[in-house]
UniProtKB/Swiss-Prot annotation:
Lineage: Viruses, Riboviria, Orthornavirae, Kitrinoviricota, Tolucaviricetes
Pfam families, per the entry: TBSV_P22
Family: Belongs to the tombusvirus/aureusvirus movement protein p22 family.
Transmembrane spans: none
InterPro entries: TBSV_p22
Highest taxon in the source lineage: Viruses
Protein name: Movement protein
Entry coiled-coil feature ranges: none
Organism of derivation: Cymbidium ringspot virus
Length: 189
């Protein structure tokens, strides 16, 4: 599958002005993940496309990630799309490690995945290996999705959703050594 990566270099203030808040998306950074379906459950009532063999493909998936933290914060992670139609949760695509302090646009022309026209499309997205210095509750970035189905020229989208830290053990560990260093300097004075 071909994927195009485009890092957009813009000043942070300009990026922040572009952010529009939509429905909230919560992604757990720890042991569990909460995912948002790529397609609405009632998509068959809205989509009219020619289907061969009763299966339909998802194509031209475009994902835009807009940071809600400073570029210097060091937030990074891998974005994945996976099939959640069964327990295996096969990954359809996983990016390289992305710097989530910059605006990122991902384009996936074709997913190696088709689904029965009589069921929901069980494709979900999430983040793994997410690293950030922030504690729970901090919103890190906004994600918006657009996609097309089969041969249809019509484009579908989800409103921008903010991803926030729910659990970040690494961030808490990183804070402890800095407190020790501060206490050492205080005792030496």
């Amino acid at each position: 599958m071909d994927t195009e990566y485009q890092q957009v270099n813009k000043p942070w203030n300009e990026l922040y002005k572009e952010v529009t808040l939509g429905n909230k998306l919560t992604v757990n950074v720890g042991m569990e993940e909460e995912e948002v379906l790529l397609l609405p459950s009632n998509f068959l009532t809205k989509v009219r496309v020619s289907m061969s063999g009763g299966y339909i493909t998802v194509r031209r998936v475009r994902i835009r990630i807009i940071p809600l933290v400073s570029r210097k914060a060091g937030v990074s992670g891998k974005l994945y799309l996976r099939d959640i139609s069964d327990t295996t949760g096969q990954k359809l695509h996983c990016t390289e490690l992305l710097d989530l302090g910059k605006e990122i646009r991902l384009t996936m022309p074709h997913l190696d995945f088709s689904v029965s026209a009589k069921s929901d499309v069980p494709i979900a997205f999430g983040f793994e290996e997410l690293v950030s210095p922030f504690r729970e509750g901090r919103e890190l970035f906004s994600v918006s999705l657009r996609w097309q189905l089969g041969l249809s020229a019509q484009c579908y989208s989800l409103p921008p959703a903010n991803v926030k830290v729910m659990y970040q053990e690494d961030a808490l560990k990183a804070l402890k050594p800095s407190k020790k260093k501060a206490s050492r300097t205080d005792s030496s004075v």
